[in-house]
Amino acid sequence: LDIDAGGKKITISAEHDIYANEINQESGLTVIDSLSSANGNISLKTAQDTEIGSMKAENGAGMVETAGNLTIAELTVKTADITAAGTLEIAEIIADSLKAVAGELLKVTTSKDLHAELLQADRVEAEAAGEMVIDELLTDYAKLTASGNADVTTSDDLSAGTIEAANIRLKAAGDLGTREEALMLKTGDRVEAEAGGLINIQETSTEPGKTTITAKSDKDDVTVETNRDLVLEDTQGQNVNVTTGGKLEAKNIEAAENGRLYMEAEKDIVIN
């Protein structure tokens, strides 16, 4: 269905599938008040910046592709596949799974759990009131916040950003952080980090208690820094460097044969 709204608001509802192509490129902005399918899928393509108020396909898939920027106030679907050449912002998403690709900025928020098969943009910001699982994160900078646990995987580097969650699990085929800059983490309890390259992480919690960290690099250095008491366990790297503002308890720490193990703590150091 080709549509030329001429800059006016669009509302489309159907019992089954919706396939819409908004062809207007002259108004500068496509405004869609509502897209709703009771028992089918929704597929929308636009040629310019697009604003969507509500998009619902609770029993189907939601697909949007735009050549410009895209904002969606409310997205409720079984699965979502969203692509924007510019920035992409989803203010509230409820979906079993999400694939989202943007050029500059990708921003996603949910009052539920967030399961993303793919999040890709120069900068990715995601916030979940529940658990957060990202199967593939491709970005130069990530800002991730979850009230529950965060489980993040990338087939590339995760070089910079901040991640805050109850527990954090990170797995990268490349680096986590850089040699010059740490990946900033804040957890209530535990961090597990695994990388094919280097690991440089700083856990920033200052609340009373301790942080438990496991960090494993296949081929490169591991650097860990915390503000409070640290339990570092099952950690290995070419060189392992550990600094904590509290007590340090180290369990099963391994540097390479010609590598260096360096530990510094404001309080006691206990090595098991």
Q: Residues of each region from the PLM?
A:
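Extracellular lectin-like interaction modules
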Residues: L1-N272
